[in-house]
Amino acid sequence: MSNARAFRLWSKAELQVPKTRKRKRVAASRPRPQSPTGPNQVWAYDFVFDACANKQTLKCLTVIDEWTREALCIEVASSIRANRVIDVLARLVSLRGAPKHLRSDNGPEFVSLAVLGWLEREGIETAFIAPGKPWQNGTTESFNGKFRDECLSLEWYRSRDEAKVIIE
Protein backbone atom coordinates (compact mmCIF):
# COMPACT_ATOMS: atom_id res chain seq x y z
CA MET A 1 0.00 0.00 0.00
CA SER A 2 1.37 3.39 -0.93
CA ASN A 3 1.87 6.23 1.54
CA ALA A 4 -0.74 8.37 -0.21
CA ARG A 5 -3.38 5.65 0.16
CA ALA A 6 -2.47 5.07 3.82
CA PHE A 7 -2.75 8.81 4.55
CA ARG A 8 -6.11 8.95 2.75
CA LEU A 9 -7.46 6.00 4.78
CA TRP A 10 -6.16 7.48 8.05
CA SER A 11 -7.83 10.79 7.24
CA LYS A 12 -11.08 9.05 6.35
CA ALA A 13 -11.01 7.15 9.66
CA GLU A 14 -10.30 10.49 11.41
CA LEU A 15 -6.92 9.27 12.68
CA GLN A 16 -4.00 11.60 13.18
CA VAL A 17 -1.95 11.77 9.99
CA PRO A 18 1.81 12.13 10.60
CA LYS A 19 3.35 15.31 9.24
CA THR A 20 5.95 14.98 6.53
CA ARG A 21 9.42 16.23 7.36
CA LYS A 22 11.33 18.58 5.13
CA ARG A 23 14.82 17.49 4.08
CA LYS A 24 17.66 19.58 5.34
CA ARG A 25 19.41 21.49 2.56
CA VAL A 26 23.11 21.87 2.03
CA ALA A 27 24.32 25.05 3.77
CA ALA A 28 26.49 26.27 0.90
CA SER A 29 26.37 25.16 -2.71
CA ARG A 30 29.94 25.16 -3.89
CA PRO A 31 31.26 22.78 -6.52
CA ARG A 32 33.25 19.84 -5.28
CA PRO A 33 36.95 20.71 -5.51
CA GLN A 34 39.09 18.63 -7.78
CA SER A 35 41.40 16.10 -6.31
CA PRO A 36 44.30 17.75 -4.50
CA THR A 37 47.58 18.04 -6.37
CA GLY A 38 49.71 18.44 -3.26
CA PRO A 39 49.67 18.29 0.51
CA ASN A 40 47.69 20.75 2.61
CA GLN A 41 45.23 21.64 -0.19
CA VAL A 42 42.13 19.69 0.85
CA TRP A 43 41.40 18.51 4.37
CA ALA A 44 38.40 16.36 5.23
CA TYR A 45 36.81 15.89 8.63
CA ASP A 46 34.11 13.71 10.10
CA PHE A 47 32.99 12.01 13.32
CA VAL A 48 33.32 8.41 14.52
CA PHE A 49 31.26 7.18 17.47
CA ASP A 50 31.97 4.36 19.92
CA ALA A 51 31.41 3.42 23.56
CA CYS A 52 33.63 2.50 26.51
CA ALA A 53 33.25 -0.49 28.82
CA ASN A 54 31.59 1.77 31.40
CA LYS A 55 29.01 2.82 28.74
CA GLN A 56 30.45 6.32 28.28
CA THR A 57 30.14 7.52 24.70
CA LEU A 58 33.18 8.37 22.63
CA LYS A 59 32.92 10.94 19.87
CA CYS A 60 36.07 11.16 17.76
CA LEU A 61 36.66 14.07 15.38
CA THR A 62 39.03 12.93 12.63
CA VAL A 63 40.80 15.45 10.37
CA ILE A 64 42.66 14.06 7.34
CA ASP A 65 44.82 15.55 4.59
CA GLU A 66 43.41 14.06 1.38
CA TRP A 67 46.72 14.14 -0.51
CA THR A 68 48.96 12.49 2.08
CA ARG A 69 46.11 10.50 3.72
CA GLU A 70 47.67 11.52 7.03
CA ALA A 71 45.49 11.81 10.11
CA LEU A 72 46.19 15.38 11.17
CA CYS A 73 44.17 15.10 14.36
CA ILE A 74 41.88 12.72 16.22
CA GLU A 75 40.05 14.55 19.00
CA VAL A 76 38.27 12.32 21.53
CA ALA A 77 35.51 13.57 23.83
CA SER A 78 31.98 12.80 24.94
CA SER A 79 30.60 15.80 23.10
CA ILE A 80 32.25 17.89 20.41
CA ARG A 81 30.31 21.01 19.55
CA ALA A 82 31.05 23.75 17.02
CA ASN A 83 33.36 25.73 19.34
CA ARG A 84 35.48 22.64 19.97
CA VAL A 85 35.67 21.98 16.22
CA ILE A 86 36.90 25.56 15.75
CA ASP A 87 39.54 25.09 18.47
CA VAL A 88 40.83 21.90 16.82
CA LEU A 89 40.94 23.50 13.36
CA ALA A 90 42.64 26.65 14.71
CA ARG A 91 45.32 24.51 16.36
CA LEU A 92 45.91 22.62 13.09
CA VAL A 93 46.01 25.80 11.00
CA SER A 94 48.58 27.33 13.35
CA LEU A 95 50.76 24.20 13.10
CA ARG A 96 50.41 23.35 9.40
CA GLY A 97 48.94 26.38 7.65
CA ALA A 98 45.45 26.70 6.24
CA PRO A 99 44.16 24.36 3.51
CA LYS A 100 42.39 25.70 0.43
CA HIS A 101 39.30 23.52 0.96
CA LEU A 102 37.72 21.69 3.89
CA ARG A 103 35.44 18.80 2.92
CA SER A 104 32.73 17.49 5.25
CA ASP A 105 29.21 16.19 5.43
CA ASN A 106 26.32 18.37 6.53
CA GLY A 107 26.40 17.58 10.25
CA PRO A 108 25.20 20.30 12.62
CA GLU A 109 28.71 20.93 13.94
CA PHE A 110 30.03 21.55 10.41
CA VAL A 111 27.24 23.78 9.08
CA SER A 112 26.93 25.95 12.20
CA LEU A 113 27.28 29.68 11.72
CA ALA A 114 30.23 29.77 14.12
CA VAL A 115 32.27 27.25 12.10
CA LEU A 116 31.30 28.77 8.74
CA GLY A 117 32.18 32.27 9.97
CA TRP A 118 35.57 31.12 11.29
CA LEU A 119 36.36 29.33 8.00
CA GLU A 120 35.45 32.44 6.04
CA ARG A 121 37.70 34.62 8.21
CA GLU A 122 40.57 32.17 7.68
CA GLY A 123 40.00 32.10 3.91
CA ILE A 124 39.17 28.39 3.82
CA GLU A 125 36.50 27.31 1.33
CA THR A 126 33.96 24.71 2.42
CA ALA A 127 33.17 21.69 0.28
CA PHE A 128 30.05 19.98 1.57
CA ILE A 129 29.08 16.61 0.18
CA ALA A 130 25.52 15.99 -0.97
CA PRO A 131 23.21 14.71 1.78
CA GLY A 132 23.06 10.92 1.94
CA LYS A 133 26.11 10.40 -0.30
CA PRO A 134 29.06 9.42 1.92
CA TRP A 135 31.05 8.11 -1.07
CA GLN A 136 31.70 11.73 -2.04
CA ASN A 137 33.87 11.89 1.09
CA GLY A 138 35.51 8.54 0.40
CA THR A 139 38.93 9.34 1.83
CA THR A 140 37.50 10.15 5.24
CA GLU A 141 35.02 7.28 5.23
CA SER A 142 37.83 4.85 4.32
CA PHE A 143 40.04 6.22 7.08
CA ASN A 144 37.20 6.09 9.61
CA GLY A 145 36.49 2.45 8.71
CA LYS A 146 40.13 1.49 9.19
CA PHE A 147 40.31 3.55 12.39
CA ARG A 148 37.27 1.68 13.72
CA ASP A 149 38.61 -1.75 12.66
CA GLU A 150 42.23 -1.29 13.76
CA CYS A 151 41.80 0.86 16.86
CA LEU A 152 38.29 1.11 18.26
CA SER A 153 37.22 -2.50 17.71
CA LEU A 154 40.48 -4.05 18.92
CA GLU A 155 40.64 -2.15 22.21
CA TRP A 156 38.08 -2.24 24.99
CA TYR A 157 38.53 1.09 26.72
CA ARG A 158 37.60 1.18 30.40
CA SER A 159 37.01 4.94 30.43
CA ARG A 160 37.01 7.97 28.17
CA ASP A 161 40.31 9.16 29.67
CA GLU A 162 42.00 5.87 28.79
CA ALA A 163 40.63 6.11 25.25
CA LYS A 164 42.00 9.66 24.89
CA VAL A 165 45.48 8.57 25.94
CA ILE A 166 45.59 5.52 23.67
CA ILE A 167 43.98 7.12 20.59
CA GLU A 168 45.64 10.53 20.66
Model-based region annotation:
Residues 1-168:
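Charged DNA-binding/catalytic regions of mobile-element recombinases
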